[in-house]
């Protein structure tokens, strides 16, 4: 089974959750660019990591050429030979073009760019309901995945907190920024004829089933 996928969608769409589920079913690796960046800046002997860490510590945006280099390095690893699910990249048309040319150099091409459609109010409800344990980092959702005891972590019995970027005003701002930044990428894949839209409100199992259908995966 070979599938090269890009996952697009607003914060709170569930991209990481769907990618993990599809990885479990198909063995196609989930590549989260957020995770790659967190890992690379921890490596003391990595020149690229050092450069990125300096930029991030100044609070500046990492330029496309460095982001592209990090992604290229990860996609060149053996586990990505027969596919990947990219989550968090590309964020710009320039990055999308770089990804295309890199895949072309490997005689590969994207199978699909999957866009999870989730309305703003649903994103707001999902993210403002999110709580985190300040001690162990476990994430809860007060609607869909609540703790056993009200507002207390099941493991630590510590009072759960809401992250600043999960407050309503911030979530609405993040959604607006997402629309502005991602629309050109959505249009880019739409013109290429590989954009597939999935309703992100139909429940995890149904969403995963839709994506598996797109890539032609069968359990049989």
Swiss-Prot record:
ATP binds at residues 12-17, 130, 139-140, 202. This is Adenylate kinase. SUPFAM superfamilies: P-loop containing nucleoside triphosphate hydrolases (SSF52540). Keywords: ATP-binding, Cytoplasm, Kinase, Metal-binding, Nucleotide biosynthesis, Nucleotide-binding, Transferase, Zinc. PANTHER family: NUCLEOTIDE KINASE. It comes from Thermotoga neapolitana (strain ATCC 49049 / DSM 4359 / NBRC 107923 / NS-E). The gene is adk. It is found in: Cytoplasm. Residues 129-166 are annotated as: LID. Monomer. Belongs to the adenylate kinase family. It catalyses: AMP + ATP = 2 ADP. Pathway: Purine metabolism; AMP biosynthesis via salvage pathway; AMP from ADP: step 1/1. The lineage of its organism: Bacteria, Thermotogati, Thermotogota, Thermotogae, Thermotogales. InterPro entries: Adenyl_kin_sub, Adenylat/UMP-CMP_kin, Adenylat_kinase_CS, Adenylate_kinase_lid-dom, P-loop_NTPase. Its EC number is 2.7.4.3.
